[in-house]
Amino acid sequence: MTALMVRIRQEHRSIAEEVTQLFRETHEFLSATTAHRQEQAKQQAQQLHQFHQNLEQTTHEFLTETTTQRVAQAEAQANFLHKFHQNLEQTTQEFLAETAKNRTEQAKAQSQYLQQFRKDLFASIFGTF
């Protein structure tokens, strides 16, 4: 019976040692996994931070370039419209001056024609003066 008790104690110790060993291995595995995951998370956080900084830099450069282009385009458009407006005003003034001159000449010609017509009409009706 004592041999059986000794054997039971040995098996109990063996089981306890196996449980302790399994606990240690599980703890080591979980510690290693936690450390690995923390390192991965740290790397991902660094990569994400770098990506965010690059994105902000790229966005800033893009917006700066776009703003510069749009300002240059607006200035060119303003210059074009200013020149167009000046040309339009000059052309309008020239047209109005030419039209006024032509109408004045036409009015003078009509006036002379009507005076001559009137003289001729009086001459034909009343005879020569």
From Swiss-Prot:
Q: Where in the cell is it found?
A: Gas vesicle
Keyword Repeat assigned to the entry: answer is yes
Q: Where are the sequence repeats?
A: 19-51, 52-84, 85-117
Check the record and name the PROSITE patterns matching this protein.
GAS_VESICLE_C
| UniProt keywords, alphabetically | Gas vesicle, Repeat
Q: Which Pfam families match?
A: Gas_vesicle_C (PF01304)
Q: Specify where the region named 3 X 33 AA tandem repeats lies, as residue ranges.
A: 19-117
InterPro entries in the cross-refs: Gas-vesicle_GvpC (IPR002003), Gas_vesicle_C_repeat (IPR018185)
Query: Which GO terms of type biological process are on file?
Result: gas vesicle organization
Any GO CC annotation of this UniProt entry: gas vesicle
Question: Is this entry keyworded Repeat?
Answer: yes
Give me the segments passing through the membrane. none
- What is the protein's known function? Confers stability, involved in shaping gas vesicles, hollow, gas filled proteinaceous nanostructures. During planktonic growth they allow positioning of the organism at a favorable depth for light or nutrient acquisition. Cluster expression in E.coli (gvpA1-gvpA2-gvpC-gvpN-gvpJ-gvpK-gvpF-gvpG-gvpV-gvpW) allows cells to float and produces irregularly shaped gas vesicles.
The similarity annotation says: Belongs to the gas vesicle GvpC family.
State the protein's name.
Answer: Gas vesicle protein C
Q: Which organism is it from?
A: Nostoc sp. (strain PCC 7120 / SAG 25.82 / UTEX 2576)
Gene from which the chain derives: gvpC
